[in-house]
């Protein structure tokens, strides 16, 4: 179980890592990979459904476009989060119990989301899939925010931002 004391102590460890200059610049592929997988999945599911269930071409096209557009939005959100995650020092990621818990929870949410989208694609085509995918995405986003937000992930982001500001100020002087 994660306590406030564990979070505070790990934030102090993170600040020490950041002060020593251990911030990494992750590769673009590391950030984009899961988002591209989600986007591809959201396009693939309605295509698969169109081969298994007879429907109009316009319904398939609508479902694919809706899934692709929503997948693109998710791609950018996931890439931003992954870039922040991979910018943390590697040693900190290996030893941090908070980051390990958050990472495992996000993997579960990822798998559940992919499964729900797959099942939803068989409930209806076209606009039904589009609205359903949006609804599922919004509900999952709220659940993730409620669950992960408890760990005050904002503290990690603040620590990284303060490091970036300090580096900019030191270059100006």
From Swiss-Prot:
Keywords: Cell inner membrane, Cell membrane, Conjugation, Membrane, Plasmid. It comes from the Bacteria. Disulfide bonds: none annotated. It is found in: Cell inner membrane. GO terms for cellular component: plasma membrane. Induction: The expression is positively controlled by the product of TraJ. NCBIfam families: PRK13741.1. Involved in surface exclusion. This is Protein TraS. It comes from Escherichia coli (strain K12). The lineage of its organism: Bacteria, Pseudomonadati, Pseudomonadota, Gammaproteobacteria, Enterobacterales. The gene is traS.
């Amino acid at each position: 179980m994660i306590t406030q004391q564990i979070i505070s102590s790990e934030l102090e460890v993170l600040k020490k890592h950041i002060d020593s200059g251990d911030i990494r610049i992750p590769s673009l592929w590391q950030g984009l990979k899961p988002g591209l997988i989600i986007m591809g999945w959201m396009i693939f599911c309605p295509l698969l459904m169109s081969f298994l269930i007879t429907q109009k071409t316009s319904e398939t096209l609508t479902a694919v476009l809706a899934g692709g557009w929503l997948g693109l939005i998710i791609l950018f959100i996931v890439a931003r989060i992954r870039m922040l995650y991979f910018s943390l020092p590697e040693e900190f990621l290996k030893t941090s119990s908070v980051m390990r818990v958050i990472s495992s929870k996000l993997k579960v949410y990822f798998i559940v989301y992919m499964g729900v989208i797959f099942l939803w694609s068989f409930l209806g085509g076209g606009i039904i899939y589009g609205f359903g995918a949006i609804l599922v995405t919004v509900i999952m986003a709220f659940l993730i925010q409620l669950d992960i937000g408890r760990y005050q992930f904002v503290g990690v982001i603040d620590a990284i931002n303060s490091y970036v500001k300090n580096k900019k100020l030191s270059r100006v002087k």
